């Protein structure tokens, strides 16, 4: 970001207005420089070095940083009659402390080493280029003002923890702390000749930049330099928010929580199992995403003649203190049964949930289908439902609740599949996966809803477990590519009926496929974004989605449990 001349002048003004900050100036080090020059037989040129401190009183009488010729001359260590200047405040040469003349190798190029840059350009040109472009390229050559000595600069290093920035600082401590009697004995010495006394003088120099340059945040007004750095950091974090929404996820993706993630991506290997985690999170995306379209209406009526039920039924609204023994004692009159508590994904699904947190529902699994028929005959039900779906209720008791009415939801096996056109060939490439289905939604109703929204539905199926009871997902096949892509693009659909309101999730139906990139490895990961829309192996996924515009893509994986259950 390039700053205008007015902004740069304002920045320099703010810097020099802070009298208490240790400034990079010879004004407070004039005596030291005179002694250094005397030791070096007056070989240094201090013709343009400022020696007079700038106080607030003088500065207030200097509009637009203009000084008279006499004032400028009075600030020189060795004033000359030929000296001319139009500015009272120090320029880039003044900020260099006259260290250009000391032949400090690498002073004007703190990002380089002595060995790599033997033939350097003039320090004046380098410092001027940094000051004219104070942000420059933060990833490349940092400005001179961002290279403080410890401890004043320690907080800034914490704000920029990237290794390349940390390593790019000019390490002056070996030079300033050296006490070798012969500079040639030290590999870090930047002087061609010197002594202990000269090293002591150099060590006492105040070369830390003003504090306004060190502070990147605060309650006061931000100067142009702070605004520039802040905007750069905002842009980088905005890019991170597209991948990882929270600081926790960002720290997992880029170890060390680097401000610039690209460096860590190149240096640290990506977690090989991050794709699986993202795919699992995507399966619950309907809970946190807004619906793109809504369907509302009445579900198709159901007319059953001698229906066949699944041996598994759902009990809703069970007493909070109910036990497995209480359930078995209540329902064993209809036949042998077992109890499945919520949390089927756990290691012990047949055990009640831990703690005193009631789930409110449970599954009963009978050994025989006729036991379900007997249970439904013992229930009270409402056959006058507008959609033809009878609601069954059974009264049961627990130790603390008497005559609690619980809802019994059976499943008719014929509701698992619906075919609109039996002669139509089903194309898996035009099939979508629908997740987060409501338990009262059968295949015919699902086909009707998606046909109203996108058209072209020829088949709908509800995924079931080993007991042929629905597991909350289904598949819908279209007869044309346009309807299929419309459904995939919709992603989230809200269904509103007189009985329930539910938001479902639509994804491409996944098959076993080879990687579409290398064609040699299995491709278990699918990218649903229209830019990709391909199957990937693990290596090809990382390679493809390391590009800047593709990092936000979410992977899909086929659910192994769904494959085994249906």
UniProtKB/Swiss-Prot annotation:
The modification Phosphothreonine is found at residue 172. The record marks 411 as: Important for the positionning of RRM1 relative to RRM2. Residues 311-408, 430-511 form the RRM domain. The modification Phosphoserine is found at residue 43. Residues 177-195 have a biased composition (Low complexity). Keywords: Activator, Cell projection, Cytoplasm, Membrane, Metal-binding, mRNA processing, Nucleus, Phosphoprotein, Repeat, Repressor, Ribonucleoprotein, RNA-binding, Synapse, Translation regulation, Zinc. Zn(2+) 1 binds at residues 515, 518, 537, 540. One of its GO terms (molecular function) is metal ion binding. One of its GO terms (cellular component) is postsynaptic density. The 2 RRM domains and the C-terminal region mediate interaction with CPE-containing RNA. The interdomain linker (411-429) acts as a hinge to fix the relative orientation of the 2 RRMs. The ZZ domain (509-566) coordinates 2 Zn ions and is probably implicated in mediating interactions with other proteins in addition to increasing the affinity of the RRMs for the CPEs. A continuous hydrophobic interface is formed between the 2 RRMs. Coiled coil: none annotated. Phosphorylated on serine/threonine residues by AURKA within positions 166 and 197. Phosphorylation and dephosphorylation on Thr-172 regulates cytoplasmic polyadenylation and translation of CPE-containing mRNAs. Phosphorylation on Thr-172 by AURKA and CAMK2A activates CPEB1. Phosphorylation on Thr-172 may be promoted by APLP1. Phosphorylation increases binding to RNA. The keyword RNA-binding applies. Zn(2+) 2 binds at residues 527, 532, 545, 553. The keyword Repeat applies. GO terms for biological process: cellular response to amino acid stimulus; cellular response to hypoxia; cellular response to insulin stimulus; mRNA processing; negative regulation of cytoplasmic translation; regulation of mRNA 3'-end processing. Belongs to the RRM CPEB family. Interacts with kinesin, dynein, APLP1, APLP2, TENT2/GLD2 and APP. Both phosphorylated and non phosphorylated forms interact with APLP1. Interacts with TENT4B; the interaction is required for TENT4B-mediated translational control. This is Cytoplasmic polyadenylation element-binding protein 1. It is found in: Cytoplasm; Nucleus; Cytoplasm, P-body; Cytoplasmic granule. Residues 330-566 are annotated as: Necessary for stress granule assembly and correct localization in dcp1 bodies. CDD domains: Bbox1 (cd19757), RRM1_CPEB1 (cd12723), RRM2_CPEB1 (cd12725). It comes from Homo sapiens. Sequence-specific RNA-binding protein that regulates mRNA cytoplasmic polyadenylation and translation initiation during oocyte maturation, early development and at postsynapse sites of neurons. Binds to the cytoplasmic polyadenylation element (CPE), an uridine-rich sequence element (consensus sequence 5'-UUUUUAU-3') within the mRNA 3'-UTR. RNA binding results in a clear conformational change analogous to the Venus fly trap mechanism. Isoform 1 is expressed in immature oocytes, ovary, brain and heart. Isoform 2 is expressed in brain and heart. Isoform 3 and isoform 4 are expressed in brain. Expressed in breast tumors and several tumor cell lines. It comes from the Eukaryota.
């Amino acid at each position: 970001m390039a700053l205008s001349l007015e902004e740069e002048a304002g920045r320099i003004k703010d810097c020099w207005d802070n009298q208490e900050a240790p400034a990079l100036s010879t004004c407070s080090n004039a005596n030291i420089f005179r002694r250094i020059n005397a030791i070096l037989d007056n070989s240094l040129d201090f013709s343009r070095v400022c020696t007079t401190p700038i106080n607030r009183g003088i500065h207030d009488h200097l509009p637009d940083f203009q000084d008279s010729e006499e004032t400028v001359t009075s600030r020189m260590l060795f004033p000359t009659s030929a000296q001319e200047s139009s500015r009272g405040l120090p320029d880039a040469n003044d900020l260099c402390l006259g260290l250009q003349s000391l032949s400090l190798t690498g002073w004007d190029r703190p990002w380089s080493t002595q060995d790599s840059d033997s033939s350097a350009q003039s320090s004046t040109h380098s410092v001027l280029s940094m000051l004219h472009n104070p942000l420059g390229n933060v990833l490349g050559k940092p400005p001179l003002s961002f290279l403080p000595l410890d401890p004043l600069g320690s907080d800034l290093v914490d704000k920029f923890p990237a290794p390349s920035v940390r390593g790019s600082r000019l390490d002056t401590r070996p030079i300033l702390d050296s006490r070798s009697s012969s500079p040639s004995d030290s590999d870090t010495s930047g002087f061609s000749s010197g002594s202990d006394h000269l090293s002591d003088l150099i060590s006492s120099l105040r070369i830390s930049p003003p504090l306004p340059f060190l502070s990147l945040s605060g309650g006061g007004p931000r100067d142009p330099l702070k605004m520039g750095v802040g905007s750069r950091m905002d842009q980088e974090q905005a890019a991170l928010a597209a991948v990882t929404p929270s600081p926790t996820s960002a720290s997992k993706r880029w170890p060390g929580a680097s401000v610039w993630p690209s460096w860590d991506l190149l240096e640290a290997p990506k977690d090989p199992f991050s794709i699986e985690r993202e795919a699992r999170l995507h399966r619950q995306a309907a809970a946190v995403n807004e619906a793109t379209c809504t369907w509302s209406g009445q579900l198709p009526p159901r007319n059953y003649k001698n229906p066949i039920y699944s041996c598994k039924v759902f009990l809703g609204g069970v007493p909070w203190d109910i036990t497995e023994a209480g359930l078995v004692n209540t329902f064993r009159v209809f036949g042998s049964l077992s109890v499945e508590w919520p949390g089927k994904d756990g290691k012990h699904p047949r055990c009640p949930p831990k703690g005193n947190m009631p789930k409110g529902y449970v599954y009963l699994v009978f050994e025989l289908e006729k036991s379900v028929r007997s249970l439904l005959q013992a229930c009270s039900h409402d056959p006058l439902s507008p959609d033809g779906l009878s609601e069954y209720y059974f009264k049961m008791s627990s130790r603390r609740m008497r005559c609690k009415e619980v809802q019994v939801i059976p499943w008719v096996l014929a509701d698992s599949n619906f075919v609109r056109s039996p002669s139509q060939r089903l194309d898996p490439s035009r099939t979508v996966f629908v997740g987060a289905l409501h338990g009262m939604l059968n295949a015919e109703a699902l086909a009707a809803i998606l046909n109203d929204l996108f058209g072209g539905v020829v088949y709908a199926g509800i995924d079931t477990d080993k007991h042929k009871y629905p597991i909350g997902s289904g598949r819908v096949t279209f007869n044309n590519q346009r309807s299929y892509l419309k459904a995939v693009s919709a992603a989230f659909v809200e269904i509103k009926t007189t009985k329930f309101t539910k938001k479902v999730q639509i994804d491409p139906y996944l098959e076993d496929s080879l990687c579409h990139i290398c064609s040699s490895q299995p491709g278990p990961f699918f990218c649903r974004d229209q830019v990709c829309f391909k199957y990937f192996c693990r290596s090809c996924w990382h390679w493809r989605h390391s590009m800047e515009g593709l990092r936000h893509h979410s992977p899909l994986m086929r659910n192994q449990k769904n494959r085994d259950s249906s």
